A protein has these predicted regions:
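Short, glycine-/Ser/Thr-/acidic-enriched flexible segments
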Residues: 26, 68, 90, 134-136, ...
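Mobile late-domain/C-terminal helix-loop "cap" segments
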Residues: 238-302
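A short beta-strand motif that forms the metal-chelation/ATP-contact edge
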Residues: 128-133, 216, 272-278
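P-loop NTPase switch module centered on the Walker A-proximal segment
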Residues: 1-52
Length: 303
């Protein structure tokens, strides 16, 4: 089986969705978003007052969130830790937030390092997905370097192969265990059809020992990709990467075959539970069918 230090395998117990959902009837900050509806959702000047940014595909708000008390504050000195909240974009159904939440649960089940995550169902028309910031620990800033920045790669267009991702990970971290983590991330993206895997969605964090390690996963969700392809190809294959491509990648980057086979088997075994999880999270049935059909096609290529 794969080395447990680099691949934890399926979690002993997946978090129950209802435990991680939060109600916001008494929340002043998110309640104001709900009261104003979509008009505020797309008002970037209003979001900026809460620390938001118009950058990226979806509007964001930076808040202080305390999971224990469920208190949310727009003040930097508020209780809890800094959490970016991502809301659906114009014309999107709030289920996009539920899908990203479900993917965060599945990523953790598959052994990927994930920051704490929450789904915030604000009202029937409005939702948010939030994660704890990976560049803050105990109030201190953690140096983070994106792969796009390290390689001067244009994240706006497909420009990388996972061979480059793994080799860059080896060069930056000097740790083959981190390379194995990057391989696991590749397998997850292939199986779960996360094709928005561009160069800016891989990063490295500096440890207290002044060493670089692969950052926790982020921006994981179902995505069909540009023209149906992965932004980052797998040994040259972006449209339909399969078992042979993943094993060739492992061999090229000195990932032990036993570890690679274990990763593929474990992640594939975690695909089916996504269906019920999407339903619990409130994803529409037709969307569930679309997502699971894509995953089944991916599983057939990896069998």
């Amino acid at each position: 089986m794969p080395n447990a230090s680099a691949h934890a395998g399926p979690a002993a117990s997946r978090e129950k969705v209802e435990v991680l959902f939060c109600g916001w009837g008494q929340d002043r900050v998110l309640g104001s978003l709900a009261d104003n509806g979509s008009s505020l959702l797309f008002e970037y000047s209003a979001l900026a007052l809460l620390g938001g940014s118009p950058q990226g595909a979806r509007p964001k708000v930076l808040v202080q969130f305390d999971p224990a008390s469920r208190a949310v504050s727009s003040r930097a000195q508020g209780a809890g830790a800094p959490w970016p909240l991502k809301l659906q974009a114009r014309g999107e159904h709030p289920e996009v937030c539920a899908i990203e939440f479900a993917y965060s649960v599945m990523a953790r089940s598959c052994g990927l390092a994930m920051p704490a995550a929450q789904l915030f169902p604000i009202n029937p028309q409005l939702a948010a997905f939030g994660v704890q910031r990976i560049d803050r620990v105990a109030g201190m800033r953690v140096p983070v370097h994106s792969l796009a920045g390290a390689l001067h790669a244009d994240f706006r267009m497909p420009s990388l192969d996972y061979k480059t991702v793994l080799r860059a990970t080896a060069a930056i971290t000097h740790d083959q265990r981190e390379v194995q983590k990057a391989f696991l991330a590749c397998v997850f993206n292939v199986v779960f059809n996360n094709r928005d895997d561009h160069a800016k969605n891989f990063s490295f964090c500096m440890t207290q020992g002044m060493e670089w390690e692969l950052a926790p996963a982020y921006d994981l969700s179902f995505n069909v990709g540009p023209r149906g392809q992965h932004q980052t190809s797998v040994m040259g294959e972006g449209l339909a990467p399969g078992r042979s491509h993943l094993l060739a990648l492992a061999k090229d980057c000195q990932v032990p075959q036993k570890f690679a086979l274990g990763c593929i088997a474990d992640v594939c075994a975690e695909a089916d539970p996504l269906g019920p999880l999407l339903g619990e999270a409130g994803v529409r049935k037709r969307t569930q069918r679309t997502v699971m059909a894509a995953l089944q096609a991916n599983l057939r290529r990896l069998g």
